[in-house]
UniProtKB/Swiss-Prot annotation:
One of its GO terms (biological process) is negative regulation of transcription by RNA polymerase II. It comes from Oryctolagus cuniculus (Rabbit). This is Protein IMPACT. Interacts with GCN1; prevents the interaction of GCN1 with EIF2AK4/GCN2 and inhibits EIF2AK4/GCN2 kinase activity. Interaction with RPL39; this interaction occurs in a GCN1-independent manner. Associates with ribosomes; this interaction occurs in a GCN1-independent manner. Associates with actin; this interaction occurs in a GCN1-independent manner. The modification Phosphoserine is found at S295. Residues 14-116 form the RWD domain.
């Protein structure tokens, strides 16, 4: 190892130890070997109104000649607001080249959240819009305890805790799929109204690992007996088109009265189209396991039938 690399490694280790000591449970080690970490930052520890997850990967050249590779995860952070915060972090790096800056970044973000809480209404604490970079906050997957028309549903993203008018449905967790350090895991709950969708999402996001996932893609279908229609919707959570693909799978399998959430923890290697395959496989596996489809064989037949119908339509045009 070069002398410079050894020096950087020592400084990184010292900074990591300091961050863990300062922030305690808020500081999470994602991949110690790859130097990937995340920290959940809020405007107020006891009564958070605004929360953001900062995920960082420390390159070998940091802090000497390169900045940390970072990702800001928050559902409300978009457009100019995201650009302004990114510019602030990059300005801190430029002003402190060669120095350890993670603490400065965290406290800058906290200042922004505090300022935001004083100026605006509370935002969602638990979901986030991200792009395909970096990961979550713990290593182990979640372990579970021992004629039809489509009607677009109202936006059910969690903006406040739902009223306790319904019992929270039971939530099941699927077997994780891991590929090139990315992990995918499905979560499923029976739902019969949008209020239950909100409740399940809120309950899931109470789990630090799930709420810190790079993406939480979901879709649901609720059959309305009186109108003979489906109430359904989906959410990409920053993984473009993933929610629509998941909903399409559920339509093909003709499942009803169910919510499926697929968490993805990105491991630093781009998967390309394979990520959509893993998302749908996770969802399909748990739907089959929980008997929302008749059998794996019938699910495959349904998919094959759908492809044939599409090909037939193409040939007719």
């Amino acid at each position: 190892m070069a002398e410079g690399d050894a020096g950087s490694d020592q400084r990184q280790n010292e900074e990591i130890e300091a961050m863990a000591a300062i922030y305690g449970e808020e500081w999470c080690v994602i991949d110690d070997c790859a130097k990937i970490f995340c920290i959940r930052i809020s405007d107020d520890i006891d009564d958070p109104k605004w929360t953001l997850c900062l995920q960082v990967m420390l390159p070998n050249e940091y802090p000497g000649t390169a900045p940390p590779i970072y990702q800001l995860n928050a559902p409300w952070l978009k457009g100019q607001e995201r650009a302004d915060l990114s510019n602030s972090l990059e300005e801190i790096y430029i002003q402190n080249i060669g120095e350890s800056i993670l603490y400065l970044w965290v406290e800058k973000i906290r200042d922004v959240l505090i300022e935001k809480s004083q100026m605006t209404e509370p935002g969602p604490e638990v979901k986030k819009k991200t792009e395909e970079v970096v990961v979550e906050c713990e290593d182990d997957p979640i372990v579970p305890p021992q004629p039809e028309n489509s009607a677009k549903a109202v936006d059910v993203r969690v903006r406040e805790k739902p009223r306790e008018v319904e019992e929270i449905p039971p939530i099941d967790h699927g077997v994780p799929i891991t590929d090139r350090r990315s992990t995918f895991q499905a979560h499923l709950a029976p739902v019969v109204c949008p209020e239950q969708v909100k409740m399940v999402l809120s309950k899931l996001y109470e789990n630090k690992k799930i709420s810190s996932a790079t993406h939480n893609i979901y879709a649901y279908r609720i059959y309305c007996e009186d109108k003979q229609t489906f109430l359904q919707d989906s959410e990409d959570d920053g993984e473009t088109a993933a929610g629509g693909r998941l909903l399409h799978l559920m339509e093909i399998l003709n499942v009803r009265n169910v919510l499926v959430v697929v968490s993805r923890w990105y491991g630093g290697i781009l998967l390309g189209p394979d990520r959509f395959k893993h998302i749908n496989n996770c969802a399909r596996n748990i739907l089959v396991e929980k008997n929302y489809t008749s059998s794996p064989e019938e699910s495959s037949k349904a998919l094959g039938k759908n492809k044939k119908m599409k090909n037939k339509k193409r040939n007719e045009h």
